[in-house]
Amino acid sequence: MNVKETKLEDVLKSRGIDMKDAYNISEADIPEAKESTQKLMDIYYTLKVTADMEAAYWYNRTWWENDGEVIEVRRAKAVAASLSHMTPTILPYEKLVMNKTKNVRGAFPFPWVCASFFNAQAEALMNEVDAPAENEADSVSVVGAGGGNVTESYGNVISIAKKFGMRKEEIPVLVKTSKPWEGISVEELSNKYSKMTPGYDQFKNIMESVICMFDSFAIPQGREVINYYMPLQYGFDGIIKLCDEKIAEVMGEAGDDGDFGMSRGYYYAAMKEITKGLSAWCENYSKRAKYLASIETDSEIKANYEKIEEVMGNIAHKKPANFWEAIQMTLCCHFGVVNEDPQSGLSIGRLGQVLQPFYEKDVEDGIMTDEEVIELLELYRIKITCIECFASAGVSGGVLSGNTFNNLSLGGQNYDGLSAVTPLEYLIVEAGMRNQTPQPTLSVLYDEKTPEDFLMKAASCTKLGLGYPAWMNNQTGMNFMMRNYGPEGMDLHDARAWCLGGCLESAPGCFLPLEYNGKVTMIPGGASPTCGTGVHFIGMPKVLELVLTNGLDKRTGKQVYPPHNKKLDSYETMVNQWKEYMELTTDVVNRCNNIQMDIWRKYNMPAVNSLLKPDCFKKGKHIGTMGARYNSCINFESCGTITFVNSLSSIKKNVFDDSKFTIEEMTDAMLNNFGFKTAYETEVFSPDFRESTDKSTKYEKIFAACVNAPKYGNADKYADEIFKAYHYYIYDMTHKFRSYYGKPLYLCQISVSTHGPQGFVTLATADGRLAGTTYSDGSVSAAAGTDKNGIYAIFESATVYDHSMHQNAQMNLKLHPTAVKGINGTRKLLDLVRAYMRKGGFHVQFNVVDSKTLRDAQLTPEKYRELMVRVAGFTQYWCEIGKPIQDEVIYRTEYDK
């Protein structure tokens, strides 16, 4: 063995790795998921996404029975009733229980949030036809046709939003439940008052052109991190006792707050009601398990039911006494919050750090083994994967792609600034490798203090092609926290508690003292409302298109923006006009969104979430009245960043710098799709397919010049300077506008799946992209097929600005499986991540998959029911993703070394 090998062997041994493994083509086999997991996953794969009216009925009934009650208490009673009356469903082999509804993949409508669609379509629904699209964004959004989606009606099932199936006998209940909300739902009240804003007509034009993807009221909660501290520390009976004490202390007392002081008593009364509802919900599961055990003849399943009876009976009243009870308690609270509102992105946070004290004691006492803990973690993944969001097709398909972004973060720093990695987090990764489900997605908060063996474990998981874990720069996240929340008192301790809310939204947190097993452990959790309910997904290439067409949308023939009537005789004139349209867009959309969210918080204030989030209970204020510790959390979401930047680069180079063409010639070529058929005609939504028309020769020179213009992602200063200038402009621009909390907006850069529908409504762009094809994905990913100088050149381009300026930055990369084979491949993958993090990059995620496999799966989806891919901050089953996004994922540049 030579000296070089000896040194490598020493290094590997110090990391607990055998030298022989470095040369193996494959690493150790991953154990199969537990039998209980496999049986329940077999059931999951057969299920359809089902909407029913049980929860909505009880909410509606209780709401109207309490007409005249104080609004906070009325709301809490209604939510509590919807939980406590839900039919408890327990499947054989389950060890963790509870779901959103009585159905495993269940969801339900929220007519008190949005009733107009159901009321307007009552006749169509009663006549047993597919519910039509609600708006323009719905009509151009595509939901995956496979898996559990119900894309069309059949038999006794009606399709709603091209995703949810509802039994025909439920439709009359839906119609009757929706009727009382006519004119007074959050949606309709918002519309009423939004019409009073001076820019309302402009707002409608923007929404109808799909420049903005959807309204805030559609998913008013989520994109935040839940906090499990209260029930883990006190238990439900303990919380009820605390509520009684607080009611006695503050009822009738305003303190020194003349605005909200008197409302503290009503807040605690509401918290008592919702806690009673959560307790009753758990009690119902305990009773159901007891009954099932009494009739079960299989001894193993009977023992499961008896254990469920014990666990659910205990957590219905007492704080958790062991790991099993603690993880079940977190599920109860999680389902409680996601049932309050239509929402996505209620993230789990740093669960492995929250539950570490319970795990540690059980292992030390011999109560559970690591394998038994892994089984519960595998089953936990199924529970989270079953969470569905009842929303329109535009939200379900065009934004979420069927995922609900329940992100679980790993690593980072603890309260004292040391590595926060716990032994339980190794098992969480292991469970994600064994039971490969879309949720919860995993995110590593990469820190220089993170143990090397944990990073290697996480990289081994990423290699499997599951799309998780993704990798975040912990230091950049902390810097953003201090920058954005410093004015609200954020200190270094709280900055260390941050993690991801939703797919990629940096969310503030705090540490709280959990007393358990004779110790006090500072556990992290969320400390803010939603971090993603602002200006939702502005298609920046579309705005640029309308600059070139004088505000006229040539696709629809509508005058979207006021004509600027300017001669675009310089690059600066064009960009300044884009800025004017962008600021007009932000102004009118933000005003209307503020009204929507203000109406929501006045009538639909969170109940469960306002119990859990610090410092609501301490202040006696719900989330809507800024009870949470941090409230500067409302964002401006962008889409198509790199398509936009590359378009600017092309126009600047070809029109203004080199004078190859006039701006009129460039615009004409774009309006004529460079002489090619559009994606509307070909039904191919990625740039790798072009079908010529008889006009193609007319535009071939200009098309070639557009394709060959400098592109972002190649460490090319020409394009990168445009990219950098954009970021400093958008930072200043977003901070000019205020949220309904009176705090500045900030930039959120996640495409999610909106680059599909927003690309669909956008004509050809100056970078050579054709009409109707998807925008570039992410925000710092190179546009597919344009990165010519390798991954490290993309890293150079991506880090020309400070990533802590914004809430996030999204980097998607696709690797061929052969590029990361064996232990050496794992090391290469980790080195790639580390290189980007050290340059200041915020986020990177990987698809490790062969494009040939994806193409075959697109043609024969029935053969690939379990295939998952990374889309944009989340993983989803391939067959449940719409074709435009499938095409985009296939066409992403694939690196094989």
From Swiss-Prot:
- Superkingdom as given in the UniProt entry: Bacteria
User: What Pfam families does this protein map onto?
Assistant: Gly_radical, PFL-like
Please report the PTM annotation for this entry: Requires the activating protein CsdA to generate the key active site glycyl radical that is involved in catalysis. Phosphorylated on serine. Phosphorylation may trigger the formation of the active heterooctamers and thereby regulates enzyme activity.
Molecular function GO terms recorded: 4-hydroxyphenylacetate decarboxylase activity
Question: Domain Glycine radical: where?
Answer: 778-897
SUPFAM superfamilies linked: PFL-like glycyl radical enzymes
Question: Where in the sequence is the active site?
Answer: C503 (cysteine radical intermediate), E505 (proton donor)
Q: Which Gene3D superfamilies match?
A: 3.20.70.20
What InterPro entries does this protein map onto?
Gly_radical (IPR001150), GRE (IPR051215), PFL_dom (IPR004184)
Q: What does this protein do?
A: Glycyl radical subunit of the HPA decarboxylase that decarboxylates phenylacetates with a hydroxyl group in the p-position. Active toward 4-hydroxyphenylacetate and 3,4-dihydroxyphenylacetate, forming 4-methylphenol and 4-methylcatechol, respectively. Is likely involved in the catabolism of aromatic amino acids such as tyrosine fermentation. 4-methylphenol (p-cresol) formation provides metabolic toxicity, which allows an active suppression of other microbes and may provide growth advantages for the producers in highly competitive environments.
**Protein family:** Belongs to the glycyl radical enzyme (GRE) family. HPAD subfamily.
Q: How does it associate, per the subunit comment?
A: Heterooctamer consisting of 4 large (HpdB) subunits and 4 small (HpdC) subunits, arranged as a tetramer of heterodimers. Also forms a catalytically inactive homodimer.
Protein name (database record): 4-hydroxyphenylacetate decarboxylase glycyl radical subunit
Q: Which organism is it from?
A: Clostridium scatologenes
